[in-house]
Amino acid sequence: MSEDRQGRSGDSNKILYCSFCGKSQHEVRKLIAGPSVFICDECVELCNDIIREELEEKAQSARSSLPKPREILEVLDQYVIGQLRAKRTLAVAVYNHYKRIESRSKNDDVELAKSNILLVGPTGSGKTLLAETLARLLNVPFTIADATTLTEAGYVGEDVENIIQKLLQKCDYDVEKAQQGIVYIDEIDKISRKSENPSITRDVSGEGVQQALLKLIEGTVASVPPQGGRKHPQQEFLQVDTKNILFICGGAFAGLDKVIQQRSNDAGGIGFGVKVKSSERKQEVGKILAEVEPEDLIKFGLIPEFVGRLPVVATLEELDEPALIKILTEPKNAITKQFKKLFDMEGVELEFRADALSAIAKKALKRKTGARGLRTIVESVLLDTMYELPSQENVSKVVVDESVIEHKSEPYLIYQAQPAPAKAASGD
């Protein structure tokens, strides 16, 4: 019966029917044949509508789940102390980036350009932590690459495509997830070219790497070896489109402040006023870096094309003593909170006195390691205590004061009061 109803495509006498809605070939405009089935143009249109609605729902869901700039800033504040201007710049840039991805799914006339980010700031000012916190908040794959290990293709070292392979590893080789991830390239200032003039000889770890990164950052389809890499050469390469991957580049850019000052002084002309202006401009490095222009980055050694691919520039200030003390105590994952938890697991309370926190901050400033050096200092002063404590009994509290930091004294151990032994009852 059903065979008579559907007919056969080779039998011109049989009337053909849509396998989905049951309409005959005479009731619809077009009937498309498949292996033993037929579908009419009306059912095709209905399927398109269903898919379109599902995609719209998906887009709306993504839009509602994307945190707004103010919400992004609130989360960054929980983990990163200070750097308000940089955090605001990042919050807006990231929000606009993921809105841009959403707009690409629609057929809009206006195509939004990609806005990768350059973070400029001293060592230990929070560049890497900002990028990590953003990725965690947005729940997207995140990887960190070291620019100093990269070389041009064909030379000893890592190819730039290795960055995308690391990103794929973070999301278990899910290409779709990786294509919306975040890549942080650290030490980007270390690949500046050696002189302002284009190099005659090959600069495989400087200008050459910048050239290799251009397409990757702007948006290209990168061919990446699948899981297992060279062990399975017969496998096809994975094609990863980088146009929706957000690239954040960071570096200390030591000496950039002098380039900025020189430009400002040159702009002031010549004469007696220049000397006065120069002395007035003895400011903090962070404030000088905030005035950075693309021409300063080019003079520093980044090629113009590379600077053009990083339109959003956020500068971070050098952390002072009060900021370092806050970093020690205030963030959700503050260093002192982490060590207090470790000691608490031994049933011991850990106390850092105010003078100890100040001494730790001063030592980090002296070493010029910023926030990154705080953990090293705390770890070193508590090492012996953490070694001995599990074997000791009745310790209730460990106190760290200034003398422990400055003079390498042992932390104070406070023991639980032992109950007095019970007196033997005297016989009558």
Swiss-Prot record:
The answer to whether the entry has keyword Cell membrane is no
Asked if Transcription is a keyword of the record, the answer is no
Q: GO molecular function, one example? A: protein dimerization activity
Q: Where on the tree of life does the source sit, at the highest rank?
A: Bacteria
SUPFAM superfamilies, per database record: Glucocorticoid receptor-like (DNA-binding domain), P-loop containing nucleoside triphosphate hydrolases
**Record keywords:** ATP-binding, Chaperone, Metal-binding, Nucleotide-binding, Zinc
Which PANTHER family does the entry mention? ATP-DEPENDENT CLP PROTEASE ATP-BINDING SUBUNIT CLPX-LIKE, MITOCHONDRIAL (PTHR48102:SF7), ATP-DEPENDENT CLP PROTEASE ATP-BINDING SUBUNIT CLPX-LIKE, MITOCHONDRIAL-RELATED (PTHR48102)
Q: Which family, according to the similarity comment? A: Belongs to the ClpX chaperone family.
What is the protein named? ATP-dependent Clp protease ATP-binding subunit ClpX
Source organism (scientific name): Xanthomonas oryzae pv. oryzae (strain PXO99A)
